[in-house]
């Protein structure tokens, strides 16, 4: 698993005098963050601690040492042991956490992470990509990604980020209501987008998506619902009814289909994330 970690922040080289005080005191790494200490010169002492600050183990590291990753939330501190110390610290995470940790973006959608475990890198269209959280992740994994959104600022942010990360993502301003996909794709992704589309255009949009998915290709849709038992709490322009999305894809093979409660990142007046029902579907074209 350590092979899958990626560095999202590299600290400068520290000497004995520049070693930050916080690292010399009891502290821990964040959830989902691994620390990688590298000694370039001299010696440093590494203390493994309990939450109460009791020493569990001590290690002396030099440039020749094989230094393991500091696990997430592990309590520790360091101490310079030589005047000529030069060291640095890198912060690592899993690929699915990289963009949220580095750029403070919304987390990759969990269903995209799951889909990427079973769908090999291929030609992908991220329909309604927003700032590109899913697009950037899929591109990082080696997918050939095209990303469309109607929001200029979102596309500009994605373009800026892909340049910084040297990722090859094709972007465009696009109104999904136009239902005008013209190329074929192996995988079309649309997460938390349908609720902003025009109700009367949805049949054409889905038909257009299906027609431009290669045989054996996939559609992933996560979309808001409104049902008799759980009416949608927000005035979205479109919500799926019970089994409505399933009916559109009745001729496809379902790898996943559920209609479950979920949460938006948006919060109510009390600061709680808004709960509602979502249709989640990963289907393969026969």
Curated annotation (Swiss-Prot):
Presence of keyword NADP: no
Enzyme class: transferase
EC number, UniProt record: 2.1.1.-
Residues that bind S-adenosyl-L-methionine: 128, 133, 149, 175-176, 191
Keyword S-adenosyl-L-methionine listed: yes
Inducers of expression: Transcription of tehB is independent of both tellurite exposure and oxidative stress.
Pfam families assigned to the protein according to its UniProt record, in alphabetical order: DUF1971 (PF09313), TehB (PF03848)
Keywords: Methyltransferase, S-adenosyl-L-methionine, Transferase, Virulence
Gene Ontology terms describing biological process: methylation; response to tellurium ion
Residues annotated as signal peptide: none
GO (cellular component) term, any one: cytoplasm
GO terms assigned for molecular function: S-adenosylmethionine-dependent methyltransferase activity
Effect of deleting the gene: Deletion of tehB leads to an increase in sensitivity both to tellurite and to the oxidizing agents cumene hydroperoxide, tert-butyl hydroperoxide and hydrogen peroxide. The tehB mutant additionally shows a significantly reduced ability to utilize free heme as well as several heme-containing moieties including heme-human serum albumin, hemoglobin and hemoglobin-haptoglobin, to support aerobic growth. Virulence of the mutant strain is reduced compared to the wild-type strain in the infant rat.
Role: Probable S-adenosyl-L-methionine-dependent methyltransferase. Plays a role in both resistance to oxidative damage and heme uptake/utilization, and is important for virulence of this organism in an animal model of invasive disease. Also protects H.influenzae from tellurite exposure in vitro; however, since H.influenzae grows only in humans, it is unlikely to encounter tellurite in its natural environment, and it is thus probable that tellurite resistance does not represent a biologically relevant role of TehB.
UniProt record similarity statement: Belongs to the TehB family.
Name of protein: Probable S-adenosyl-L-methionine-dependent methyltransferase TehB
Organism: Haemophilus influenzae (strain 10810)
Gene: tehB
């Amino acid at each position: 698993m350590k092979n899958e970690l990626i560095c999202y922040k590299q600290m400068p080289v520290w000497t004995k005098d520049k070693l930050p005080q916080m690292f010399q005191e009891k502290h821990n790494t964040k959830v989902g963050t691994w620390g990688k200490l590298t000694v370039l010169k001299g010696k440093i002492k590494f203390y493994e601690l309990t939450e109460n600050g009791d020493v569990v183990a001590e290690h002396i590291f030099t440039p020749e040492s094989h230094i393991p990753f500091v696990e997430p939330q592990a309590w520790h501190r360091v101490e310079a042991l030589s005047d000529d110390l030069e060291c640095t610290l890198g912060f690592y995470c899993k690929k699915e956490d990289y963009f949220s940790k580095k750029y403070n973006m919304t987390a990759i959608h969990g269903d995209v992470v799951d889909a990427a475990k079973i769908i090999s890198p291929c030609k992908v269209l991220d329909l309604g990509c927003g700032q590109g959280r899913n697009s950037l992740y899929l591109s990082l994994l080696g997918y050939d990604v095209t990303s469309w959104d109607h929001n200029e600022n979102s596309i500009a942010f994605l373009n800026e980020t892909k340049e910084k990360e040297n990722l090859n993502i094709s972007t465009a301003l696009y109104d999904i209501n136009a239902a005008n996909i013209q190329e074929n794709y192996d995988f079309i992704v649309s997460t938390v987008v349908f609720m902003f589309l025009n109700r009367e255009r949805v049949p054409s949009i889905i038909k257009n998506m299906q027609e431009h998915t290669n045989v054996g290709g996939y559609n992933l849709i996560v979309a808001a619902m409104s049902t008799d038992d759980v009416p949608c709490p927000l005035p979205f322009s479109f919500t799926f009814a019970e089994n409505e999305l399933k009916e559109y894809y009745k001729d496809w093979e379902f790898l996943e289909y559920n209609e479950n409660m979920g949460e938006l990142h948006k919060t109510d007046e009390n600061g709680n994330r808004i709960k509602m029902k979502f249709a989640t579907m990963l289907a393969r074209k026969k």
